[in-house]
């Protein structure tokens, strides 16, 4: 996409340096006029969150005050950093001197509540021990929902699909097996994308006769689909990030399976982060005239610091009676049932049905898109609304920052009641339980189950003081310890995603 194309939008917003400074204008993707029986909803999207939830919510409030509207949903595209207490910091793949508590712990403890429904995927800098409790997603705090390793859920009847983590070839074919305590390697592999997750997401594609629809409204990933710069102004991108060109040309920039996901699922919007630059692209789909699906509008956003383009507002049309709440997607639930045997919890390479291998797959079936009969079975589950009252604190909340609260051992791994309830309800394997049962070591009693005396007991002491230094950016996207990037994003405008 050339930056010379005309657009009707403003540049994406940066943060604010002080409480009295207005944010820069945000990009606003505006759909066609609302028809009878429709209403508009507004979704705020941010790139890497880096634990800066206070600043992100404050920026949203300023935008709302300036423009006279309210956001209905916030989407965060990874590096969310859901750190509950200082014990979670060793579970983050960040050098110890850069580990910082940030502000999520306030929302986990109940000191603050997210002012808007918040949805996020995982990146490569996460409190992985906590997220591993929720492989299929769940509430990490009141009003804040994690999508799990891969998921498709609905909001206002919009279908939102998400893929957590970043690509690494060495771990791509393995099942998910990591949980605390993490080895030095496992704390990195825990956030690596798995082929089984992408295989499940590809089953969201439409039936073979449907060539014109966009089955997914919004798709999220942390790193970029490999090859996406070819669909945008890549010359501009390579001027801004001079090391990206070599990675792109060698096929190392982003997830090499990402474009297949775009072509299979044809999302209307694809939102990403990770590379700390705002970049737009437009991916066309096959067809002509009225028989052609909408193109996929790709947008990656920056990190939340002053002057950087880290937030975008989407205006989307939905049905007048659409409920502004999260619900499970029937097709995704059926896919989880259909592919249940691919959940193993052990460190093994998975042979998927669409792979050529000398080893047999556990399934003879090749196509796991749900049949009409399988979807009827999902209907028997009843109401698919995601309950908002199922959150429970598994690790102790941090209620006061003291020296003793900093000097604690790494957090244990916990049985999460949300995972137990979801898997029992759907009738699928419970990866959280499988990981708990691997060994009794480093398995803790969930905080919500403890008596007050237990909760007030002094924890085992550790000599590590993690400190509160600001987080430094991740320095790459395809290796365990990537090299530093040389160039930085300046304040030029980028081309915004056009509307129809």
Curated annotation (Swiss-Prot):
Its EC number is 3.1.4.-. Residues 462-471 have a biased composition (Acidic residues). GO terms for cellular component: nucleus. Residues 164-194 are annotated as: Lariat recognition loop. InterPro entries: Calcineurin-like_PHP_ApaH, DBR1_C, Dbr1_N, Metallo-depent_PP-like. It is found in: Nucleus. Coiled coil: none annotated. A divalent metal cation 1 binds at residues 48, 50, 276. Keywords: Hydrolase, Iron, Manganese, Metal-binding, mRNA processing, Nucleus, Zinc. Belongs to the lariat debranching enzyme family. Cleaves the 2'-5' phosphodiester linkage at the branch point of lariat intron pre-mRNAs after splicing and converts them into linear molecules that are subsequently degraded. It thereby facilitates ribonucleotide turnover. GO terms for biological process: mRNA splicing, via spliceosome; RNA splicing, via transesterification reactions. It holds the Pfam family DBR1. Binds 2 divalent metal cations per subunit. Active in presence of diverse metals including Fe(2+), Zn(2+), Mn(2+). Binds two metal cations in two adjacent alpha and beta metal-binding pockets. Residues 472-500 have a biased composition (Basic and acidic residues). Its cofactor is Fe(2+); Zn(2+); Mn(2+). Residues 1-25, 453-500 are annotated as: Disordered. A divalent metal cation 2 binds at residues 79, 124, 222, 274. GO terms for molecular function: metal ion binding; RNA lariat debranching enzyme activity. This is Lariat debranching enzyme.
